[in-house]
């Protein structure tokens, strides 16, 4: 980490986690177990309601790989219940701009994640299918794939369109 004003440089240690690779359609999606732990913890904290948010990552077209780097916090204007989650917008633009600034625009928005309640798998519901279609329509305008990640009690489902 460097200080632009003083020119000082300091070290910042981060914990490394094993990487998980999943084939989703024509894409390979990679994320580390630290992100998986974060998603599972966030889900548990929100129960009995669903939760979710935006996913940031790196899209590598040459290797058809999407690296999931992190998720943005759930906006305070989000709506959730045990049966649904609708992500709000408050603070999202600023949070994404901060990610882009810190990573020289290497890391960007790649999609959405949400949880399913107790007793349900991570299989996409009809509403989830409609959401990934809408997300794909928006992102394909810029030539980008859309990622949807669903976290349930015992499984994680990643869809790329």
For each feature predicted by the language model, list its residue ranges.
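Conserved beta-strand-loop surface patch within small alpha/beta domains used
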Residues: 1-109, 117-161
């Amino acid at each position: 980490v460097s200080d632009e004003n003083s020119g000082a440089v300091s070290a910042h240690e981060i914990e490394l986690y094993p990487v998980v690779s999943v084939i989703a359609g024509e894409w390979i999606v990679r994320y580390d177990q630290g992100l998986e732990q974060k998603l599972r913890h966030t889900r548990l904290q929100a129960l009995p309601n669903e939760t979710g948010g935006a996913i940031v990552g790196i899209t590598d077209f040459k290797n058809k790989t999407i690296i999931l780097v992190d998720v943005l916090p759930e906006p305070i204007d989000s709506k959730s219940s045990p049966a649904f989650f609708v992500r709000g917008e408050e603070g999202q633009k600023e949070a994404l701009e901060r990610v882009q600034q810190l990573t020289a625009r290497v890391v960007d928005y790649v999609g959405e994640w949400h949880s399913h309640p107790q007793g349900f798998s991570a299989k996409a519901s009809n509403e989830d299918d409609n959401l990934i279609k809408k997300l794909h329509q928006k992102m394909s305008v810029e030539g980008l794939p859309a990622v949807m990640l669903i976290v349930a009690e015992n499984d994680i489902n990643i869809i790329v369109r």
